[in-house]
Amino acid sequence: MRIKEKPEDFVVIEKTNFSIAEPSKYYDQFKFMGIKDNGIPGDYTIYVLKKKNLSTTQAIKIIAKQFRLSKYRISFSGEKDKKAITYQLISIYKGPKKSMFLDNLELYYIGLSDKPVKLGSHLGNYFEIKVYAESPKGFDVFPNYFDVQRFGDKRLVNHLIGKHLIKNECEEAAKILLTFVGKESKKTIKVRQLIKEYWNNIEKLKKVIPLMPKALDIEKAYLQSFIEKKDYCKAFKAIPKWILMLFIHSYQSYIFNETLKMYLKNKTKIIKIRDLLEFYFADYYENIEIPLIGYKVNAKGEIKEIIDYLLDKEGITIEMLKNKKVVGTYRKGFQKMYDLKIKKNQKWLTKFYLEKGSYATVAIRSLFLEPIDF
């Protein structure tokens, strides 16, 4: 099964209930996203961002540069797929009341608000996905796994770094951050190999710094800090806090996935799919919540037994989670594809709605019961 052969094959439209004031001429064009015109005017300028073949983070950097303002004045509700055409709401603190039209990015000014668009404030996403596969033979309900992008882009290691950070095993976390090789450029791989070779030689590590490509900006910040401080833990302070939290959230996601897999393993009619990750799918929906581990969440029954087993195996304690201020939360164990429509042409056009936090790629696997050819 193939998806995302080109950006037009994967369309994502954010659903929101955000309220604006003083709607612009573009407001009617985007009312279908759920935007309301009963808001209060204020210091936040609201836009619809349409992007193609760009991550949300890349798009924000371009907007900041074009408008000559700090990217930290820009906020959005959630990161959208890169190899796709996506629509989402963004806000800029005291941003210009104008639109922007570039090759892969269109920004439509739609109004004002007294509040910003906040992370996680959208309701869900509509999807239109072209699937190159034989035929749908699966289910419109699915175990609510985190998909591969949660664990990294070209290296599926974010959860491993997060695990070692929680355990305060800073050297181990640093080794994975700096030396683990993924599907990267030859230059990047060479730099990682040099760092591994020079691991215990500060003077030689200094010579690697000028060789590090732009793609390794996080690694470069860490290595420079380590050379200066000579302390694996203190050097992590050179990395933005939100990135460190991303590693820890990735580990929470890993434990969630493993819990859900173990929970499903003994059930009936389980279908196993393996591509970059391993998934178990089932033909039923169950209304359960599974913790994203933290010191303030409590599991019960079979779920508790599984999580206790996994954390013991991983060497993670509640005290460690408390020390890293990992509070935890809950996530639905199963999800549904709402308003599902499927049409056959040369490929399968699937249209559906998912609540926020669920992955369309996981839903598609469940529907077609095939691994995705990345």
Swiss-Prot record:
The keyword tRNA processing applies. Residues 141-340 form the TRUD domain. The active site is at 81 (nucleophile). It catalyses: uridine(13) in tRNA = pseudouridine(13) in tRNA. GO terms for molecular function: RNA binding; tRNA pseudouridine(13) synthase activity. HAMAP family: TruD. NCBIfam families: tRNA_TruD_broad. This is Probable tRNA pseudouridine synthase D. The lineage of its organism: Archaea, Nanobdellota, Candidatus Nanoarchaeia, Nanoarchaeales, Nanoarchaeaceae.
